[in-house]
Each structure stands twice: as C-alpha cells, then as structure tokens.
From Swiss-Prot:
Pathway: Cofactor biosynthesis; NAD(+) biosynthesis; NAD(+) from deamido-NAD(+) (ammonia route): step 1/1. It comes from the Bacteria. This is NH(3)-dependent NAD(+) synthetase. It comes from Streptomyces coelicolor (strain ATCC BAA-471 / A3(2) / M145). Keywords: ATP-binding, Ligase, Magnesium, Metal-binding, NAD, Nucleotide-binding. ATP binds at G51, I52, S53, G54, G55, V56, D57, S58, T168, K197, T219. GO terms for cellular component: cytoplasm. Homodimer. Catalyzes the ATP-dependent amidation of deamido-NAD to form NAD. Uses ammonia as a nitrogen source. Deamido-NAD(+) binds at R148, K181, D188, H268, K269. The keyword Magnesium applies. The gene is nadE.
Length: 276
C-alpha cells in the first residue's frame, strides 16, 4: 500500500472511532459524566449498571458512573449506580476488584457467580453432541459464553431497576475487535468511546484511581486453559502501538498491517446485524 493511501486509511479509521486530535483528562471527565447524567434525566431511567473486574477500564468507567448518578440526584432525579461483581467461581485477582470498588464507592454492589450458568450451558452443548475442534477451541467458546453470561446478568439487573447497562469499550478495543460480540460488546451506553488505552489510563489517573489498577496489565481472562493471558499477547501488538496508530502517529509497517487486518476481520462486531 502506498504511503498516501495508508495514511488516508489510518485517518479514516481514526475518524470512525471518534478519536480526538487533542485530549484533556479533566475535560473528558466532565463531558462523559455529563453525558451519563443527561441520559438518565432525559429518559427517566433510574440506574446505571456495570460489571467491575478490577481492570483500568471498568474502574474508570465505574467512577464516572458514580459521579453521574450523584449529579443526577443533585438535579432532583432518582438514580443509583449498581456495580456488579461477576466472577466465574473464584477470581484470581479478586483483591484488585475489591480495591476498584473501594475507589469507586458505588451506591450498590451486587455479586453474581456466573460459573453455574456458564458451565451448565457448555454441558448442555456437549450433551447435544456439539463437537469442538480441540480442547482449546472448546475453551474459547466457553470463554465467550462467560462474557455473554455476564451481560445477561447485567441486563437482568438493569431490567429490575429501570436502568442502563454501561459498557467499557474504547477506541483501542474497538479497532482491534477485542471484545465478545453480544458479551462485553453489548451495552446501552459506552462512556469511554473514542479514548485510546493511554487516555483511559489518564482519565483514571485524573479521577484518582489506584496506580496499581491504572497500570495493571490488561487481560480478558476468559480462557481456563490460558488463564491471565495478556491482551497484548493475544493481539500481536502492544496497546502503545495501537494508541500511536489511533492518535495519528507513525507506526511500523508490521504494526500497521496487524491493526488494519484485525480492524477489517472484526468489522461485523461494530455493525448492526446484516440484512438483505
């Protein structure tokens, strides 16, 4: 691909994912808190619901949610933030999740163990003679079941309390399609949209999030056979490289091709269902 064409493609992707040329953490906090509060007051809904894992994305989004419901209440609107713990059995980094909750100070904390439902779904598939290529393929599918089960639980809580489910998707995940379709990719509002990973961290820093959580190595941690696998190992590029691409900075040809290939392969994740 010629240099002008590659630059044009990079700019097109940056525009589609709404990554701004300039960034100010305090301004972004105000804009995103105002957005969430306005969605509550304008729709008459009474809750925000978000799963808290202990990573920087949910920690940052969680604090924005709590600030938003407090703002809505100050304006006379009834609203609560429900922070959900959604472990699959025992979570290895549960201490991080609890540290995140201590920082966020949510109105309500609900814990739902997704292991029984997720494992039962896999068992039912196996009982129906659904065949997988190998144990790793089965483990991957099971991981997606876990992600979708978490969203089922969050939507149930939102339905019970007249609320909105909050997603943690941001530009670095969107460009790589690094989320589960109809799992963590399903949400009603996505307050981190347009932020690169380093900008999410900057917002977390500005909010006062614990440094250990802000700098924590990101991991989806969905696969039992490969626990704690870092996002960057799965992606084949680092978040620094993805962020450079999204912020319009030069990257190596290999990084460019890796990002663009993933972007194209995962296009369906960012679209409405295909129709004739």
């Amino acid at each position: 691909m010629s240099e002008p064409a590659s630059i044009a493609l990079q700019k097109e992707i940056v525009r589609e994912l709404e990554v701004a040329e300039t960034f100010d953490a305090e301004r972004e906090i105000e804009r995103r808190v105002a957005f969430l509060a306005e969605r509550l007051t304008s729709t008459g809904l009474r809750a925000l619901v978000l799963g808290i894992s202990g990573g920087v994305d949910s920690t940052t989004a969680g604090r924005l949610c709590q600030l938003a419901v407090e703002r809505a209440r100050a304006a006379g609107h009834e609203a609560l933030f429900y922070a959900m713990r959604l472990p699959h059995g025992v979570q290895a980094d549960e201490d991080d999740a609890q540290q995140a909750l201590s920082f966020i100070r949510p109105d309500r904390v609900l814990t739902v163990d997704i292991k029984p439902a997720s494992d039962a779904a896999l068992d039912a598939l196996l009982a129906a003679d659904v065949a997988f290529r190998d144990p790793h393929h089965q483990d991957f599918v099971h991981g997606n079941i876990k992600a979708r089960q978490r969203m089922i639980a969050q939507y149930a809580v939102a339905g019970a309390h007249g609320g909105l489910v909050v997603g943690t998707d941001h530009a670095a995940e969107a460009v790589s399609g690094f989320f589960t379709k109809f799992g963590d990719g399903a949400a009603d509002v996505v307050p981190l949209t347009g932020l690169t990973k380093r900008r999410v961290r900057a917002v977390g820093d500005a909010l006062g999030a614990p440094a250990a959580l802000v700098r924590k190595v990101p991991t989806a941690d969905l696969e039992t056979l490969d626990p704690g696998k870092a996002d960057e190992d799965a992606l084949g590029v680092t978040y620094e490289e993805i962020d450079d691409f999204l912020e319009g900075k030069p990257v190596t040809e290999q990084v460019f091709e890796t990002i663009v290939t993933r972007y194209r392969q995962t296009d369906h994740k960012r679209r409405l269902p295909i129709a004739p």
